[in-house]
UniProtKB/Swiss-Prot annotation:
Keyword Ubl conjugation: no
CDD domains listed in its UniProt record: FAR-N_SDR_e, FAR_C
Cystines in this chain: none
EC number: 1.2.1.84
Region: Necessary and sufficient for PEX19-mediated localization into peroxisome membrane, residue numbers: 451-507
Annotated gene: FAR1
Peroxisomal side: 484-515
Subcellular location(s) of the protein: Peroxisome membrane
Protein name in the entry: Fatty acyl-CoA reductase 1
Similarity remark: Belongs to the fatty acyl-CoA reductase family.
Organism encoding this protein: Pongo abelii
Primary localisation category: membrane
Role of this protein: Catalyzes the reduction of saturated and unsaturated C16 or C18 fatty acyl-CoA to fatty alcohols. It plays an essential role in the production of ether lipids/plasmalogens which synthesis requires fatty alcohols. In parallel, it is also required for wax monoesters production since fatty alcohols also constitute a substrate for their synthesis.
Record's subunit section: Interacts with PEX19; PEX19 mediates the targeting of FAR1 to peroxisomes.
Amino acid sequence: MVSIPEYYEGKNVLLTGATGFLGKVLLEKLLRSCPKVNSVYVLVRQKAGQTPQERVEEVLSGKLFDRLRDENPDFREKIIAINSELTQPKLALSEEDKEVIIESTNIIFHCAATVRFNENLRDAVQLNVIATRQLILLAQQMKNLEVFMHVSTAYAYCNRKHIDEVVYPPPVDPKKLIDSLEWMDDGLVNDITPKLIGDRPNTYIYTKALAEYVVQQEGAKLNVAIVRPSIVGASWKEPFPGWIDNFNGPSGLFIAAGKGILRTIRASNNALADLVPVDVVVNMSLAAAWYSGVNRPRNIMVYNCTTGSTNPFHWGEVEYHVISTFKRNPLEQAFRRPNVNLTSNHLLYHYWIAVSHKAPAFLYDIYLRMTGRSPRMMKTITRLHKAMVFLEYFTSNSWVWNTDNVNMLMNQLNPEDKKTFNIDVRQLHWAEYIENYCLGTKKYVLNEEMSGLPAARKHLNKLRNIRYGFNTILVILIWRIFIARSQMARNIWYFVVSLCYKFLSYFRASSTMRY
């Protein structure tokens, strides 16, 4: 069987979502590890006054492509930016571009999607379902297409506790939903959304389930593979450890925890944190397309790209390693010292929200006003709470994903491909990964230099001293207000102090005894 780089040699690849997190990494990996690929067509829309070519060039100029620039300086010649709007009829392709794509494309990687959990249902359906259907219809016209590779999500069927590598029946017929949305106004769509999505937590997951069914039904005559990643995080190894460029998913929570803004979150310590590194998702996508292209399986291939079944990691462990990392390598200008409480208790959660989030933010905004600056912390806390509401479903529940197809795929790789396109998450050391992840948010998202660590540590020590001073003042105030005015309270206080003194005296005496 040919190797993965050999399979991609001379191939023309069509990629959607190339300006997104996953798409960028896939583009870089494809060009670096399969250097003889003929060309990569990237569908990109105009945005903020930038042409598709300018947007692609901005992506290629980023740090993510540093390694590729060193190894293959001429890689840009293989990338062809094509103006396309996935939400428009026929993808808004010009006739000339459409003809080129139909004549040349061998492999499609469909990574584009709206990943916002609070997306309006109409918009989510438009990009995640209708755009996917239009791409399938375009693929059916391609004369040399070998594989249609669709990136979904492992949570598409999160209403099930055990999820196999199959496409399940959709919650509603996608065609009927699309037809209904055409005559509904936005108010009606918003009203019926909770009833439509049912036991799924958001429109993103709901529409990704519909998209899978569209791929299965509309692409029945195509050679289709689906990869379902769980919670996609920073890179594990490639192009370098810890690369991340956005606040999405856990990244924003990690940063908020490192800044000392996030102090509590509704989560179960024992719930599985099914994080999967972005380079594992990319490697699996490239390998899955290779397998389907070489073997031409009779049925659609689905791969649950998850870690919980083979290398379990829990949210309590995530919290421990995140806080430990940020205490050793603090973020600059932290609001408070990093410390997070995980709780699944409703009352306790809201207590900590009031005491550890809202009260400090309110007091800090008063301080900003008094010093002539614009208050901002309450707005930050409000945005943080909205993000937490969307994520608590995933931090409070666990799922079991079948990974038989993933194991089969891994066994099909030759020794060299197993190294180059590593998908074996059993080798993943979580403590090291989380440390690199946190450092990645510091370096690549916040653009903080590691040379600033001494100053950041000094600032963290200052916050510690402020905390000790505040607690001391609080104890004195409690003494003056309550204890000093009550004889019973004073007697209890003296008894406790006396008991502590006797214990310390006994401990001292015991420690100086020689045997």
